C-alpha cells in the first residue's frame, strides 16, 4: 500500500487574513475558492508543489462539530485505492470517525485519529474533478 500527503488543512476565524498571510509570506497561489453545502468558505492554496486548505470556522449557533477547532484541522493522506487503503488501515487497528463518504462525485473521504488525537483524512480525489474545479476558480464540487 502506498500513501502520500495530499494536503494540510487549517481552520481559521478570518479566512481572508490567512489567505493574505500565506500569499505575502510564502508566495502562495490561490487555486480554488469554494463554499460547500454548509456555507463555510474554503480556499485551497498552492505553496511550491504542496497544497494547503484553509477552512473557515462555523458560527457559534451551528451544532457542535467534533472536528471543530482552530489551528491545524487535519492532514490529508492520499490513497490511490481508497477501499483497499481503508481496509488496510482498519486491519492495522485504525479507529475511524464515522463511515467513509463521498461529499462530491469523484471525492472519497474518511477521517481517523492518530494516538495523540490529531485528525487524519484518508482521501481519494479524482484529479479530473479537482482540475475542473480549479479551472472554474470557484466551484461547489
Predicted features along the sequence, with ranges:
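N-terminal beta-strand motif that seeds the catalytic metal site of vicinal oxygen chelate
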Residues: 1-17, 72-77, 126-141
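Active-site beta-strand termini and strand-to-loop segments that position acidic
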Residues: 45-48, 112-115, 125
Amino acid at each position: 500500500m502506498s500513501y502520500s500527503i495530499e494536503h494540510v488543512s487549517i481552520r481559521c476565524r478570518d479566512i481572508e487574513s490567512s489567505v493574505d498571510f500565506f500569499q505575502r509570506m510564502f508566495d502562495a497561489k490561490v487555486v480554488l475558492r469554494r463554499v460547500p453545502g454548509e456555507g463555510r468558505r474554503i480556499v485551497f492554496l498552492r505553496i511550491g508543489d504542496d497544497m494547503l486548505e484553509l477552512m473557515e470556522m462555523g458560527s457559534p449557533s451551528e451544532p457542535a462539530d467534533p472536528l471543530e477547532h482552530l489551528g491545524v484541522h487535519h492532514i490529508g493522506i492520499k490513497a490511490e485505492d481508497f477501499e483497499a487503503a481503508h481496509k488496510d488501515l482498519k486491519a492495522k487497528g485504525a479507529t475511524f470517525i464515522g463511515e467513509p463518504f463521498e461529499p462530491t462525485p469523484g471525492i472519497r473521504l474518511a477521517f481517523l485519529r492518530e494516538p495523540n488525537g490529531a485528525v487524519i483524512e484518508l482521501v481519494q480525489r479524482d484529479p479530473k474533478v479537482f482540475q475542473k474545479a480549479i479551472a472554474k476558480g470557484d466551484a461547489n464540487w
